[in-house]
């Protein structure tokens, strides 16, 4: 494939902290502090909430550890908080758990584990997770090689992404994988994509 998995992982992990919706205070207080670049205060607020089991705070705290903002950078701690949030169904955290396994950051590299967590985020409707899952199926990395499933996920990702770079990546991936597929296989992939519905998993 022409789209490197790791570059997509990195791009999403950087962007998602400032685009994830947050609830009313005190979680919002941490978000306001983060946007004001008072990372220490954000870390203090989210740490307190994360320890009570709040999955959004756990996810956000994981990002602070991953980036070394307000706390010392600690990839293992980042993974710990991502995993706790992911286990509660937080899709963004599930994506970052997958990214951690894919790159071997904070946890030993694991292709099967990466695929498992990309799938969980993809099933909740995260387009970049869907793209990555399609790439894994296209290459047979961590999952069975399956062009029909690959194209299915590319089709789903394409309709969920805004115009621009990532959508162009999906279009290229669709072209690449479909070049070696029969008409029946392409139609089956499109049927699966049409029938697919997101399945929210938790908080």
Segment roles from a protein language model:
Residues 34-38, 51-54, 67-69, 74, ...:
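Short helix-capping/linker turns of helical repeat alpha-solenoids
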Residues 9-20:
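Bacterial N-terminal signal peptides
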Residues 1-10:
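Bacterial N-terminal signal peptides that target proteins for export
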Residues 165-203:
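Terminal, low-structured helical/coil segments at or just beyond the last alpha-helical repeat
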Residues 26-33, 45-49, 60-67, 96-103, ...:
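Hydrophobic face of amphipathic alpha-helices that form TPR/SEL1-like repeat modules
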């Amino acid at each position: 494939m022409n789209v490197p998995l790791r570059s997509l992982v990195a791009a999403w992990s950087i962007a998602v902290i400032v685009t994830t919706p947050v609830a009313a205070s005190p979680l919002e207080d941490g978000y306001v502090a983060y946007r004001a670049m008072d990372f220490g205060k954000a870390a203090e607020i989210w740490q307190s909430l994360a320890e009570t089991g709040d999955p959004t705070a756990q996810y956000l705290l994981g990002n602070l550890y991953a980036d070394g903002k307000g706390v010392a950078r600690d990839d293992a701690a980042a993974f710990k908080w991502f995993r706790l949030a992911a286990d509660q169904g937080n899709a963004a955290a599930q994506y970052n758990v997958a990214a951690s396994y894919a790159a071997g950051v904070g946890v030993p590299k694991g292709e099967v584990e990466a695929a498992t967590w990309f799938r969980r985020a993809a099933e909740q409707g995260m387009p970049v997770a869907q793209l990555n899952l399609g790439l894994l199926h296209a290459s047979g990395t961590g999952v069975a090689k399956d062009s029909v499933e690959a194209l299915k996920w590319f089709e789903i990702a394409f309709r969920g992404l805004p115009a621009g770079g990532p959508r162009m990546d999906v279009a290229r991936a669709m072209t690449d994988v479909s070049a070696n597929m029969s008409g029946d296989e392409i139609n089956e992939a499109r049927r699966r994509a049409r029938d697919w519905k997101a399945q929210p998993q938790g908080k």
